[in-house]
Amino acid sequence: MNLRQVEAFRAVMLTGQMTAAAELMLVTQPAISRLIKDFERATKLQLFERRGNHIIPTQEAKTLWEEVDRAFVGLNHIGNLAADIGRQAAGTLRIAAMPALANGFLPRFLAQFLHKPKLQVSLMGLPSSMVMEAVASGRADIGYADGPSERQGFLIETRSLPAMVAVPMGHRLAGLDRITPQEPGGERIIKQETGTLFAMRVEVAIGSILRRPSLEVSLSHTALSLVREAAGIAIIDPTAAIEFKDSIALRPFSIFIDAGFLEVRSANGAPSTVVDRFATEFSSFHDALMAQSGLIS
């Protein structure tokens, strides 16, 4: 028994005629007849009764057909799945991201990326250190984090962005085109907790103004929410700030403080067209939305 014989049997059962089955398989009618005879010999079953120009499936043929049809449905499913994977329409994608991205930017992008219904995606919002661990352990295919760009065992792409100053709507500083370290005066500064690379960069660049009355928070979104409620001002990463751009004022800072992020993959990870496409499209989406919002040029 071979697959071609099974295909011939299926074609005859589907069409009910040898001639139509031959057309379906793009072979001659004698070739179909020969394949059916060989299949009957291999199975030791009489599958069809010949009545003139007509063939009638036997009960044995009907019983066998149920299994053959199930098998071909399974093969078709495998074929369709392989085609979907080739078109990057199916597969799995596990993303780990720091909260500044996981709480706003990535959901925006995923809403349009997930138009492929067979793509299984998980998004984990984690501190940057845990993002790196998730990628290293294989729990995430790609990660977005803050941290040093030189790390062994990772493939890292850096995305540099200038920090901005977030102030309440109608605040005196909102009227400025650019804010210098001296201009906050006695304003309450909302700063991110010590320990993150971004917080360290801010401390190094403008440590003197951080000695003024301040609030300390762990998340960019918390700082931005406090700014919106006029509890103070904050030096913030624009990726998080975009979610608040209609409820606060964002102004460039005169000193460049890198508020970018890293795209991280494992150096030992298997290549994936789905991950490659996600990374490329997210990068384009991020840059386009930031430029459209006027937060970067």
UniProtKB/Swiss-Prot annotation:
Q: Which UniProt keywords apply?
A: Activator, DNA-binding, Transcription, Transcription regulation
Q: Which InterPro entries match?
A: LysR_subst-bd, OccR_PBP2, Tscrpt_reg_HTH_LysR, WH-like_DNA-bd_sf, WH_DNA-bd_sf
**Where on the tree of life does the source sit, at the highest rank?**
Bacteria
SS bonds (residue pairs): none
Q: Name one GO molecular function term.
A: sequence-specific DNA binding
Name a Pfam family for this protein: HTH_1
The HTH lysR-type domain extends over: 1-58
Q: Can you tell me which family this protein belongs to? A: Belongs to the LysR transcriptional regulatory family.
Function as written in the Swiss-Prot or TrEMBL entry:
Positive regulatory protein for the occ operon involved in octopine catabolism and uptake. Also acts as a negative regulator of its expression.
Q: Can you name this protein?
A: Octopine catabolism/uptake operon regulatory protein OccR
Q: Which organism is it from?
A: Rhizobium meliloti (Ensifer meliloti)
